[in-house]
Amino acid sequence: MKDKKQLKQAINALNRIMEAELAGVVRYTHYSLMVFGYNRIPIVSWLKGNAEESLQHAQKAGEMVTLLGGHPSLKIGALLETEKHDIGDILRESLEHEKSALACYHDLLKIAEGNSVLLEEYAREMIVKEEMHVDEVNKMLRRPGDLEPFQE
């Protein structure tokens, strides 16, 4: 990136992504410990997989920060304990988290467009992944046979 202001904006956006993804690690790990009932095993496995993927996403964002000469954040994104552990509540909170992460990647894309092919491609790749996560959670929240996207 040529412009120092844009470089700083990109590093800040990447740090926000890293923080959001690290919050996802904690969130999904917590959820995996709070699932009970007949469907526990596949749901716990799915949640643990999301925690692992969030960690990989955080690491990738951190690598981008250092590639640009920045310092990766030690902060973690917002974590609110709702004390609701019904699987529907967990999935609704997961959907909000995924949408929030998606917004962070869109913010990065706006900064990168026309300034860095590397960051543009990274942001686009991650937007695709996050949109797939949003869709997956949305489908899990639907009643069997519902074709319309879930809306609260």
What are these language model-derived features?
Residues M1-E152:
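Iron-associated oxidoreductase/ferritin-like identity signal
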